[in-house]
Regions:
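Residue-level recognition of tetratricopeptide repeat
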Residues: 116, 156-157, 198, 232-233, ...
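Short beta-strand elements
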Residues: 677-722
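Intrinsically disordered, low-complexity Pro/Gly/Ser/Thr-rich segments with frequent PxxP/GP/PP motifs
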Residues: 614-658
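N-terminal leader/linker segments that initiate helical-solenoid repeat arrays
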Residues: 26-131, 135, 143-153
């Protein structure tokens, strides 16, 4: 009996059938063990976006539609990403994207664009968005039956079609029934279980939310979203630090790139006095933060590392780590400053220090103070104070609130009160902090009392601090210190011990422990020596981390470039004008851990393509704009598995260069940045990422001579020939600038243009529209062709004009589009005019010449506005 026949409620069978009819992830359940020799069976290859089913080249109509689809998409991308595009603009863009996709259904980019724009218009036109989304998902499923993202989207789309939450819950439960799990595959089942958990949470079913969240983690522990959610949720319900370690270890293993999870794990370990494990964790967290270029977290984790070493009695190692890392961080900080202000002198630059978290400043100063190195202590104090000055200046430059600025002034005051020698500036600092709103009356009283303590007024300080110390660790530390000054040593020992026991793993707790060791004359006193319960708790946490956080993760972090193997290969390295080609991007999981693919995963769901090519007439390569490319066709890669994504080059910046400058010869270098760091804008690799180059690609270009022109004038008359269409486009580029024509035939330019116009008119409208989309900017020589194009009544040609050539909001062709009788085209014309108008105003505002521009710029009397 079929699986779906056993379901006893309506409306779900179709969803289950959809889940089971879609091809499962064959390799997800059969990944080889780490010690098993790898074979090519682990390869997961996506269906190429250029059809590969036939060895024959596409026929004329198929190929010209592919070319026109790509030409429209090339201009639709920037149009739909314009900052001022309206809701109607998104709707018009969706309609055009659907046309592009239907013209070339065997190519993926247009369908991806349909999905993107369907999400944008869903709020305003939900029915149209839903229909477009379903059509796109169905087409993508045919192109690549193993596309996990598409499979899940189709299932979610079918489930969301149910009218009630209860019906959607039953649909999820049917899909996730035990008999269906094998067909779904563990990664897909985990994500569906998480979606069901989220639905139960919205309904208010806490128990079922817990159940399905646990199911999601159980099905696929490498699914980062579920692992992180489980760590956050279940930690709130168990008062057990060892359980916290287990949950957070699963989340870290699922996504070591998530720095917030590292921070949470470190907090649990330090709070529990598990300094050995905290040291291991902090070193890994620093490596990830450095790779992700998150300097603010590098500072924070460096403070945690110093605290872990300090807490375990490794004072010398802590001092060494701080010196090593802070020197490097200071160099990086000064390098950035010198880039931002090239005029800065070396003397001024030497006085610049990075802003540091207060915990890191206290750790550095506390360790140096205990060591008795006065010179080093003074240097570190200056560094800490200059760092707070830098933080204040940054906050003021960014227009932060006065309270935010006040918080940084307060950090400076705390540093001075704990370690400073000259306290003359503290009263004014505290007054400024109060005025900023960052400090209330009770806080002001505490700091006034601390100032009295540092000024030698122990009795005054003790009287003011005594009622505050119960709930204020800093006040208690100052109170204990004042007790020492008042020669009340036994009471001071009690207070310092209390702070050390209740604030284990914090800079303040370790400062108190150092003071306690001095008072007890025990040179090396560590927290576990204070009580057996502290020692036992630390051992439990150390054991828990060793058990649940595998050493394979240490291996990955120590050698991140070995975890992912990336290869980039073009389909050809010799490309002629308007020739179609592809890039193959292969990524292999070479580690011993499964890795998810996605936006918040160990393997990013996108890579960045970087490319460079010399400008015409120059030899030095110029960087082309970086371009993100989606690769999230799979949910995860098991050890030894790889994914191969084929990308159509004509919609990359490299392919667009070929279209814009088809006559020129280019030697193009291409590389792919995997796991691009968000801190670098995606242009540099983050953790586990790399920059992988492809073999250089030679664009052959065209040598425009008399023989080539003669041959072209004959060839463009050939009917039903792609070569005739592309040669016509090349001839237009050559004839658009008379200087490009051989001197011997420049007198024939009118006849050449007559041939061009005749050939263009004789071509089918799809070819006409494509040529219109790839023509160069309008020149006087092009007037005959431009006039012929303007007189066309073909809606296909008019669409090409609207999306590829209009930059002037007053272009008369927009009215022609509106009068065409095609409502969809009229809507596109309105949207293009809106965006063109906003772009022209932005351009005027940027140079501050809007009024002058309106007064002096002549009206456009040319044949067309150009691209």
């Amino acid at each position: 009996m079929p699986i779906h026949a056993s379901l006893c409620f309506p409306g779900v069978c179709a969803v289950t059938a959809l889940a089971l009819a879609t091809a499962p992830i064959a390799t997800a359940q059969t990944a080889p063990a780490p010690e098993t020799p790898q074979t090519t069976a682990g390869t997961i290859t996506t269906t190429a976006t250029t059809p590969q089913a036939s060895v024959n080249a596409p026929d004329f109509q198929t190929r010209i539609k592919q070319m026109l689809s790509a030409a429209w998409l090339a201009d639709l991308y920037p149009f739909t990403r314009d900052a001022d595009i309206s809701d109607e603009g998104y709707e018009a863009g969706l309609a055009l994207a659907l046309r592009c996709a239907r013209m070339a259904p065997e190519r993926r980019p247009a369908w991806d664009m349909v999905l993107l724009l369907a999400d944008q218009v869903e709020g305003g036109t939900p029915d149209e968005a839903r229909v477009a989304r379903r059509e796109a998902l169905a087409a993508l499923a045919k192109l690549d039956p193993f596309d996990d993202a598409v499979r899940l989207s189709r299932l979610a789309d079918a489930i969301e079609a149910h009218p009630t939450a209860d019906a959607r819950v039953r649909a999820y439960e049917a899909i996730l029934a035990p008999q269906n799990r094998a067909a779904l595959g563990a990664p897909a089942a985990a994500r569906l279980a998480y979606q069901l958990a989220s639905l139960e949470s919205r309904i208010g079913n806490t128990e079922l939310f817990s159940r399905w969240l646990a199911e999601a983690v159980k099905a696929d522990p490498s699914y980062p979203t579920a692992a992180q959610a489980a760590a956050g949720y279940f930690r709130m319900r168990v008062a057990d630090p060892a359980a916290d370690i287990e949950l957070l270890s699963i989340a870290v293993e699922a996504n070591p790139r998530d720095l917030s999870t590292w921070s949470a794990l470190l907090s649990v370990l330090l709070d529990g006095g598990a300094f050995k494990s905290a040291e291991r964790t902090a070193r890994m967290a620093i490596a990830v933060a450095e790779a992700e270029r998150r300097n603010e977290l590098v500072y924070s984790f460096t403070g945690d590392l110093a605290t872990a070493l300090w807490g375990s009695g490794q004072r010398q190692e802590a001092s060494h780590e701080l010196d090593l890392r802070m020197n490097r961080l200071t160099e990086d900080y000064r390098r950035v400053i010198s880039l931002m202000d090239p005029s800065i002198t070396n003397e001024r630059l030497a006085r610049e220090f990075p802003p540091l978290p207060s915990t890191l400043s206290i750790a550095m100063l506390g360790i140096a103070q205990k060591d008795g190195d006065t010179k080093k202590f003074d240097l570190l104090l200056e560094r800490a104070l200059r760092g707070t000055d830098a933080e204040v200046k940054r906050a003021e430059d960014q227009g932060s609130s006065t309270a935010d600025v006040g918080s940084f002034l307060l950090q400076r005051a705390v540093t001075l009160l704990l370690f400073g020698k000259d306290l003359s500036t503290v009263p004014k600092l505290l007054d400024d902090v109060v005025k900023s709103g960052a400090l209330g009356d009770q806080g002001k009283a505490r700091f006034d009392a601390m100032l009295a303590w540092r000024q030698g007024k122990a009795d005054v300080a003790l009287k003011a601090l005594e009622p505050l110390r119960a709930n204020d660790a800093l006040a208690q530390y100052a109170y204990a210190s004042a007790l020492v000054d008042a020669k009340r040593t036994p009471e001071a020992i009690t207070e310092f011990r209390t702070i050390a026991e209740t604030h284990i793993g914090t800079s303040l707790g370790l400062l108190a422990l150092d003071r306690l060791s001095d008072l007890l004359a025990q040179p090396k006193l560590v927290a576990p020596q204070l009580s057996k319960s502290i020692a036992d708790r630390a051992e439990v946490l150390n054991t828990a981390l060793a058990k649940h956080l595998p050493t394979t993760l240490d291996e990955i972090i120590d050698r991140p470039f070995r975890a992912l193997t990336v290869e980039v290969k073009p389909s050809s390295t010799l490309i002629g004008p308007y020739e179609s080609f592809t890039f193959g991007i292969r990524i292999r999981n070479s580690s011993r851990l499964p890795m998810a693919i996605g936006g918040d995963a160990p393997i990013s769901g996108k890579v960045t393509m970087r490319s460079a090519a010399p400008r015409p007439g120059e030899t030095d390569a110029a960087e082309l704009p970086p371009q993100p490319l989606l690769i999230d066709r799979r949910l995860r890669l098991m050890p030894g598995e790889e994914i191969l994504v084929t990308v159509d080059a004509d919609l990359t910046v490299v392919g667009m260069l070929l279209n814009i400058q088809p006559l020129d010869s280019h030697l193009v270098s291409v590389s792919v940045v995997s796991n691009p760091s968000s801190a670098s804008g995606g242009q540099a690799p983050g953790f586990l990422g790399s920059v992988t180059g492809a073999p250089p690609i030679q664009f052959t270009g065209v040598t425009v001579n008399e023989a080539w022109v003669k041959d072209s004038r004959a060839l463009i008359r050939t009917a039903g020939s792609i070569e005739a269409v592309t040669r016509l486009a090349l001839l237009i580029h050559a004839a658009a600038d008379p200087a490009l024509l051989p001197e011997s035939i420049r007198g024939d330019a009118p006849a050449i243009w007559a041939d061009i116009v005749a050939a263009w008119k004789a071509m089918p409208e799809t070819a006409q529209a494509w040529i219109l989309g790839v023509m160069p900017r309008d020149t006087p020589a092009m007037a005959p062709l431009v006039e012929a194009a303007r007189s066309s009544t073909s809606t296909t040609v008019l669409r090409s004009w609207a999306i590829t050539r209009v930059s002037d909001p007053t272009d008369s062709m927009l009215d022609v589009c509106r009068r065409s009788g095609d409502a969809e085209l009229a809507k596109l014309a309105d949207a293009v005019q809106w965006v063109a108008d906003r772009r022209s105003k932005r351009a005027a505002d940027e140079v501050g010449l809007e009024t002058e521009r309106a007064r002096t710029m002549p009206k456009d009397t040319g044949a067309g506005s150009g691209r």
